């Protein structure tokens, strides 16, 4: 059997996961009678009767083919492999406005005025889309913004070389991040070392689509009717990836199957040397949201894990990707802290009930070593959670956007909780150390007592013998 058969690779052909024209999705009656009727229309805009067109444009992922590969557990057993980050915005539906060039302002849902954010005709449709459940948004195929923590670190020079020669994309480095653009639809890899690669850039793709879009959005009164719909439709044919040196990959506008394929290439490609200490399946962390290009939005915003951005500016996505990557990395340490503390909670209770741990010195040292290793890792992650130097030095205008996104992901409060748990770990280390020292001191004390007793016995015997010898 050949290597290709072992990998279960389908025949080489184009993966058409992006429809060129929007489709209309009629209300489902049952699983057998549901049909998809293609209709030609304008690209997605949220106003009047354009909601069906938006749903149709995102319909391409419903028909995307699921490919079996070594990372199939990301799809088949996702809840077992991925741990939801411990943040309340998963369920609280908090609204945060993402600033562009001014200070950060965050609002709760009751405090927000939707008419200040959108035109009145578009406000209702936006609220309706934002309140859709996550599963419904996934079913409709809304673009995904997903972060995966899959290893301890990436070898960025090797990853850059791999993406260039196998995925046919040019990667640009921003300090500790690699940024690459993929053109959709993706095609199957040209060799057995990779599963997919970037599709060819279309001839009608403008060289400055992002700049053109941003220029129009910067105008005081954007003309919705004259807006270049072709530019907007092209934005959904571009996907972006950010690879962070501390073991996190952030995907923008990839389907779930495409994300798995690229992760499989990064895991098993390049002679397995792209990653440092790959994580086991149950240790991998995922942070997934959805986003939408909303040219009529006066300010970018995030609500109910739905991001609305007015343009495809890669610097804006870079700032948000930094926050996403830090959140998923923090989630990994939250999980490790929970597992370690749960395994050690029994011993303080036992110490309180019986006055001793009931462990050998080797077991106590081993437990202390686990806790101390976690303490060291938490101290190391404090450097990762700092504001990236790139934002301080090169793009200071993106700091408010990065700060607002961190606020939504609750990185600050979660870090404080992690630090408090570390203090508990320090106390447990101190207790274990004192218990081990007390046990050792007790052993030394008993040895001294026994030696003194032996000395007294020997001295007594010597005195008795001398007295008997003197009487003779």
UniProtKB/Swiss-Prot annotation:
The UniProt record lists the keyword Nucleus: yes
Pfam families in the record: DUF155 (PF02582)
Modified residues (Phosphoserine): 42
Keywords, ordered alphabetically: Membrane, Nucleus, Phosphoprotein, Transmembrane, Transmembrane helix
Feature: compositional bias, Polar residues: 30-40
Segments on the Lumenal face: 1-443
Region ranges (Disordered): 1-47, 197-223
Transmembrane portions of the chain: 444-464
Signal peptide span: none
Compartment(s) where it occurs, according to its Swiss-Prot or TrEMBL record: Nucleus membrane
Residues exposed to the Cytoplasmic side: 465-472
GO cellular component, one term: nuclear membrane
GO BP term, pick one: mitochondrial gene expression
Topology of this chain in the membrane: Single-pass membrane protein
The keyword Membrane is annotated on this UniProt entry: yes
Family: Belongs to the RMD1/sif2 family.
Subunit annotation: Interacts with sad1.
Name of the protein this chain belongs to: Sad1-interacting factor 3
